[in-house]
């Protein structure tokens, strides 16, 4: 499944996330309260992946899934041992991703992320992953070129219609 990210245009998130769903994609998180996602800053503050996951479990409702972003195989191993629900493989090449999949061995949901766009998404084809997340589907979407020139035509048409439907008292 293809997921968007929170990387959206200010004040346009609701529309951009809706467009992802209409286009067949899925929303990752609408805001920070939707799920717990531990990134490098959280890991650094906690001291380790294991400690970050432990603290997240301790201070969050049991129903919330804990996702952790990892950048190497050592991080994957630690995340699996610590019991992460979702492991995001960030910016990993395909060979490293294949090794990570073996290490995870269905013990967690696998999400691949990092510079994923329309030109390179096929690299994940055939891999046993659950999700691919891409900020490009919102922050790099092509803008539809709209013109207001047609409004002039509509205004002319409405004026003509009014003239034809007006009773002329001089006749």
Say what each PLM segment does.
Residues 158-170:
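Short, low-complexity, charge-dense intrinsically disordered segments
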Residues 136-157:
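Short, charged, intrinsically disordered terminal tails
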Residues 1-82, 86, 98-103, 109-112, ...:
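Acidic/glycine-rich phosphate/pyrophosphate-binding loops and surrounding catalytic core
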Residues 107-108, 152-153, 160:
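Short alpha-helix boundary/capping motifs
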């Amino acid at each position: 499944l293809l997921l968007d990210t929170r990387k959206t245009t200010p004040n346009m998130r609701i529309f951009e996330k809706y467009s992802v769903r209409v286009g067949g994609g899925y929303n990752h998180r609408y805001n920070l309260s939707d799920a717990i996602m531990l990134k490098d800053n959280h890991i650094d503050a906690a001291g380790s992946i294991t400690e970050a996951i432990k603290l997240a479990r301790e201070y969050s409702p049991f129903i919330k899934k804990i996702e952790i972003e990892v950048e190497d195989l050592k991080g994957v191993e630690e995340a699996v041992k610590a019991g992460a629900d979702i492991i995001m493989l960030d910016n990993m090449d395909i060979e490293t991703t294949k090794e990570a999949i073996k290490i995870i061995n269905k013990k967690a949901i696998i999400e691949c992320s990092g510079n994923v766009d329309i030109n390179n998404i096929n690299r994940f084809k055939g891999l046993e992953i659950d999700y691919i997340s891409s900020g490009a589907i919102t922050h790099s979407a092509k803008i539809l070129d709209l013109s207001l020139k047609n409004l002039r035509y509509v205004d002319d048409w409405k004026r003509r219609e009014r003239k034809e439907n007006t009773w002329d008292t001089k006749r």
